[in-house]
């Protein structure tokens, strides 16, 4: 069995399925001077090797591998973020959803991001960093690396990032604390945007055309916008913890001289997959996931027309003809109990990385905070709704929706609960949001923030990583807590799980470094410890 530590050094592990003829070496010096064990001519050629590495990196940001997606996304962030519930009582119902965290599941997340994302993207950086003709590819790899690794840090905290491929004299690979990791993300985005600004208006290179799995035109402009929108996302992520850093980075993203943000649905970033979307397989082939009760409450209460674009109506006789979701962390005795609740409608074989509606909601919050070049909060908020409705072909319904000042999330009733009423969220519950849709200038800043985040959450579906991160960061949207908590008092039922632990194999092979990382956390390595940016003070 490979140790996790070997994944932090460029030994080519688990890439052989793509690169069967690629020779590898464990010599650190050689790897830094001659990455992947090939000559410059072999590496560049018709760009096939670079494109293959970049394809693997792009598809690993959210993992197109269905097994890994299920345990590292669908049974963690997709559920904790209020998008999906599981109808199966995995591991005797003592699993991630009931806060009895399964080591093999969170180990999959950790390994996947380093093998399939960080490893190939770092290789591309080494292969292109000194080649003036490949600067666009170098910048592209930087953006993808930040896209993948911020999601990793947002799940666990301190990560191996700036010290990747740099073992110490004891062969330990050390972590960045989360604050330093974020600052390094911003530095990498600085590098990428500085380069891509010089490519604006230029013909897209053959290497970029071959490597980009999202866009077929205006590639440089759109990836520059992705980088700026990503910077704004990360700036707001730290805003409750380090307001000065957030403002500096956020205003850099908002400065129009830096290339702009995602604006139109044509800018939406979806990565083409080599197989069916993992959520389709998990939903239909495996029958393991259904609509979450929280998103049922919001979409149903708002009479949101996007509901019918996302989910099927339930076929269970108890709720037939309704849209019906499952709460996370409930008593489940058999898969058949909830198997006929609402399924996700089939998704195309492409993975949503970032959409323009998110950009407008980010700008709305930035305006609420008074950041330069953020514009007007109300206009940005309504533009976010417009872009989301447009994405689903519902533009004609957007105006009435934006003007709806009365509808609120609806109570949740589960007629199939093992114990009647156990899973219900009734009117007046503190876990039932009362936020309406229409912008109200008279509301407090905190109320406005709840409105912005709630609509952003709906618009980002099905990106559970961002849903869960924003919920922990801001406290919004107001989601239903677990009913059953098997964490042995290590994870609070309210406000819920805060992170995933480090894998056991990391303790076995990189013990000094991971123990140092746990000290950086400021708490035990369990699901109840808050991340650096997860401030207890969430008031604007």
Name each model feature, range by range:
Residues 1, 24-27, 57, 146, ...:
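Terminal processing/anchoring signals of secreted or surface-associated proteins
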Residues 1-22:
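Sec-dependent bacterial lipoprotein signal peptides
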Residues 20, 66-67, 394:
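Intrinsically disordered or highly flexible coil/loop and linker segments, enriched in small
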Residues 24-82, 104, 112, 127, ...:
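Membrane-proximal, proline-rich intrinsically disordered regions
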Residues 33-35, 340-341, 428-433:
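Short acidic (Asp/Glu) and glycine-rich catalytic loops that position anionic groups and cofactors
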Residues 69-73, 310-313, 396-397, 464-473:
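Short coil/turn segments at secondary-structure boundaries
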Residues 86-144, 148-397, 441-450, 455:
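Structured, solvent-exposed acidic/aromatic patches
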Residues 401-540:
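C-terminal functional modules
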């Amino acid at each position: 069995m490979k140790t996790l530590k070997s994944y932090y050094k460029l030994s080519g592990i688990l890439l052989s399925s793509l690169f069967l003829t690629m020779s590898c070496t464990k010599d650190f010096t050689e790897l830094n001077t001659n990455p992947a064990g090939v000559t410059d001519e072999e590496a560049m050629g018709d760009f096939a090797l670079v494109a293959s590495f970049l394809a693997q990196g792009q598809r690993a940001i959210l993992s197109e591998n269905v097994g890994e997606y299920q345990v590292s996304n669908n049974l963690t962030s997709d559920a904790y973020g209020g998008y999906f519930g599981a109808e199966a009582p995995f591991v005797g119902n003592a699993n991630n959803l009931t806060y009895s965290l399964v080591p093999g599941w969170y180990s999959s997340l950790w390994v996947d991001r380093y093998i399939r994302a960080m490893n190939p993207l770092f290789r591309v950086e080494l292969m292109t960093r000194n080649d003036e003709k490949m600067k666009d590819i170098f910048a592209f790899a930087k953006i993808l690396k930040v896209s993948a690794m911020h999601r990793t840090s947002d799940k666990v905290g301190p990560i191996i990032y700036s010290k990747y491929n740099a073992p110490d004299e004891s062969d330990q690979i050390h972590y960045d604390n989360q604050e330093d990791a974020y600052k390094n993300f911003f530095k990498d985005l600085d590098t990428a945007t500085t380069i891509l600004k010089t490519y604006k208006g230029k013909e897209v290179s053959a290497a970029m055309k071959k490597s980009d799995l999202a866009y077929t035109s205006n590639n440089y402009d759109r990836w520059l916008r992705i980088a700026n929108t990503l910077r704004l996302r990360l700036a707001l992520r730290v805003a409750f913890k380090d307001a000065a850093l957030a403002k500096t980075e956020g205003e850099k993203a908002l400065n129009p001289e830096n290339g702009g943000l995602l604006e139109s649905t044509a800018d939406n970033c979806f990565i083409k997959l080599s197989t069916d979307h993992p959520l389709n397989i998990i939903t239909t082939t495996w029958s393991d996931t259904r609509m979450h009760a929280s998103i049922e409450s919001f979409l149903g209460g708002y009479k949101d027309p996007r509901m019918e674009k996302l989910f099927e109506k339930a076929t269970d006789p108890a709720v037939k003809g309704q849209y019906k979701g499952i709460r996370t962390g409930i008593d489940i005795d058999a898969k058949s109990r909830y198997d006929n609740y609402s399924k996700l409608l089939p998704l195309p074989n492409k993975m949503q990385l970032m959409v323009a509606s998110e950009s407008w909601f980010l700008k709305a919050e930035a305006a609420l905070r008074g950041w330069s070049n953020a514009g007007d909060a109300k206009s940005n908020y309504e533009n976010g709704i417009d872009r989301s409705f447009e994405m689903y072909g519902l533009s004609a319904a957007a105006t009435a929706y934006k003007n709806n000042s009365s509808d609120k999330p609806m109570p949740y009733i589960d007629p199939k609960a093992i114990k009647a009423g156990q899973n219900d969220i009734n009117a007046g519950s503190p876990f039932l949001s009362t936020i309406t849709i229409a912008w109200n200038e008279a509301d407090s800043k905190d109320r406005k923030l709840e409105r912005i985040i709630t609509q952003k959450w709906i618009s980002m579906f099905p990106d559970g990583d961002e849903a869960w991160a924003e919920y922990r960061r801001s406290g919004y949207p107001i989601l239903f807590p677990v009913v059953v908590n098997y964490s042995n008092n290590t994870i609070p039922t309210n406000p819920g799980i805060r992170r995933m632990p480090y894998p056991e194999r990391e303790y076995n092979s990189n013990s000094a470094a991971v123990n140092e990382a746990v000290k950086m956390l400021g708490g035990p390595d369990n699901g109840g410890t808050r991340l650096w940016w997860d401030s207890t003070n969430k008031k604007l």
